[in-house]
C-alpha cells in the first residue's frame, strides 16, 4: 500500500476580514512560499467582513462610541435598546441591506488574483462560502432574514469568480455548521470545522 504524506499549515486568524487577508496574510513571505508549494489551498474569508459591518451598523444606529468586541456584544446592546424602541431593528436591517458590497468584492478579487499568481500549476483552490454566523444568536427573525440576504449577496460574489480563478466553492451556507459552533455562537467548533 502506498503511503500518502501531507503537511497542513493553517494561517487563519480570528477576526481577520478580506482586507486583512490581503494586507497581513498574503504579504507574509512564509505564506507566499507555502501557497506556491501547496497542492491544495483552502480559503475561508468573508464572515468577519459581515460581522464587522454588523458591529459598525449597530454602533451607528445606537449612536454610540462603544467599540464592540464582537458581533454578539453589539447584538446584545441592540436587543436591549430595541426592547424600548422596536424600530431600531428595522433601522439595522435597512442599514445592513444598504451595505456597499463593492469593497468586499474588490478585496475578494485582489485576494484571488494574488493567490492565483502564487499557486503552482495544477494546485486546487477550495473556498467556503459564508454561513449565517448569527443564526444561533437571539435576534429578531426579521433581522436574521436581513442578515441572510446580505450573506446570499456575498456568496454570489464568491461564486461569481469561481470559474475565472479556477476554484471550487464548498457550500457551508446550506450545511449544518450552525449546529456545531463554539460557545460564542459564531465560530465553528471542531465538528463544525470538519
Place the predicted regions along the sequence by residue.
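Serine-esterase "nucleophile elbow" of acetyl-processing enzymes
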Residues: 1-13, 30-34
